[in-house]
């Protein structure tokens, strides 16, 4: 029985040994190694030769310090395996070892173990990315360190490799020469000088740690294009400075142009106020005082005595106060009127010869008197007022109207007539040339009232009136008018009387002296006005004429003077209508 048990054990042993011999028939993997980056640990092995489609590989991991192997995965047909999850503590441990075998059904191969220990020094150093930019002709780069997702929060590249980090930078120009420029920096920020070259530049970075033997891997190539920078900071500053200067110059020119063309203030003498349409409509023009021109009644004027018509009154503009101012009309031609009735003048001369009277002023050559002098009554008896012409030493320079009102104190008839407009004296009975045209003459002017102290005792009041002849050659005539009432005219106050022709007629030139008290309607040459019309109290002309009854006697000579002394002009002229 003992021999049966020995045979059974030998058979079992032979079966077991046969099974072991059959499992060793597959070849083992040629090599096993780790390829690790920062927190990316991969185990690689080499496949067995002549493997079938059913061949797979088993992996076991051994950590230093622990004696047993730890099977990591089931059989897989891949040639690599990611051990990152089971080796997270790699950077804080002594390292790991791994082994791999091939399995094909019931057969398997021997284990192939890594040749080296997998530690931190086996980790290949890399960078996450490289960022490039251009600034003032420099390429500025920034290295981004790797940030793996599976890494613990406290395990970063900076914390693990805290010292002696270095980066090697390679620059390549595309296109053109492909020479690389290598540069090492110790910081993640770097700058590269391009030397003014333009084109595309590509940069690569490889990290390293000076205190370790870790390998570094070149990063992915980053490229940037360089062109000529026209809008640099310097160029922009220069451009804006130029624009600012140009704007300032334009503003100055514009301001100067506006200053030159601005509306300037005119002098006050050149300012004209625009009339407002409302003011122009509302305001009415004020009436202006104008010279009154009266028409001449030629038929009535022919009835006036030739002595009164031919008197020289045109050149007189005297004020009557003895001023030496020359007349403004002395150079004007004299208007002389012929005497249409020479016989009447002789008859008048026989009855009452006119008296040649002296001027009221001492020197008639320089006199600018109006020529009308109203003498005070003399103590000697008088036959009546006479018309008397002023005769001076030099009648050519006289600016007198030629009318003088004096009183003949001696009562004698003058045997001499006034001189002509040319200044010569004529006999009492002149022969007026027949060829003279009997033109009708109208004049208006002022008559002066004065007292002649030199002739108070020698003359009675004579009113002498001169009328310029048309040709300037006729003699001057004087006529004395005797007041039929026999009253001596009182002394007259100094002043002016306006002579204004009205529609009144005078008696014919041949009438006797007593017939001068004609109705006022017959006077056309001399206008009669009442004494009450004289409105100026200083002259007191109406008061002095009250005894004469100038209002009661319309034919009186003194009533023929108009009293409009304010509004009418001083200088009068003779108007002749032919």
Swiss-Prot record:
Q: What disease is associated with this protein?
A: Inflammatory bowel disease 28, autosomal recessive: A chronic, relapsing inflammation of the gastrointestinal tract with a complex etiology. It is subdivided into Crohn disease and ulcerative colitis phenotypes. Crohn disease may affect any part of the gastrointestinal tract from the mouth to the anus, but most frequently it involves the terminal ileum and colon. Bowel inflammation is transmural and discontinuous; it may contain granulomas or be associated with intestinal or perianal fistulas.
UniProt keyword annotations, A-Z? Cell membrane, Cytoplasm, Disease variant, Disulfide bond, Glycoprotein, Membrane, Phosphoprotein, Receptor, Signal, Transmembrane, Transmembrane helix, Ubl conjugation
Q: State any GO CC term.
A: cilium
Kindly state the positions of the motif BTRC recognition motif in this protein: 318-323
Record text on subunit structure and interactions: Interacts with IL10. Interacts with IL10RB. Interacts (via its cytoplasmic domain) with JAK1 (via N-terminus). Interacts with BTRC; this interaction leads to IL10RA ubiquitination and subsequent degradation. Interacts with STAT3.
Q: Name one GO biological process term.
A: response to lipopolysaccharide
Start-end of Low complexity biased regions: 357-371
What ranges does the Extracellular topological domain annotation cover? 22-235
Q: Does the keyword Glycoprotein apply?
A: yes
The entry annotates sugar attachment on 50, 74, 110, 154, 177, 189
GO MF annotations in UniProt: interleukin-10 binding; interleukin-10 receptor activity; signaling receptor activity
Major location (coarse):
membrane
**TM helices/strands, residue ranges:** 236-256
Name it: Interleukin-10 receptor subunit alpha
What spans are recorded as compositionally biased (Polar residues)? 316-332, 377-396
**Which segments does the topology annotation call Cytoplasmic?**
257-578
What family is this protein classified in?
Belongs to the type II cytokine receptor family.
Between which residues do disulfide bridges form?
56-75, 202-223
| Organism whose genome encodes this protein | Homo sapiens (Human)
Q: Where is the signal peptide?
A: 1-21
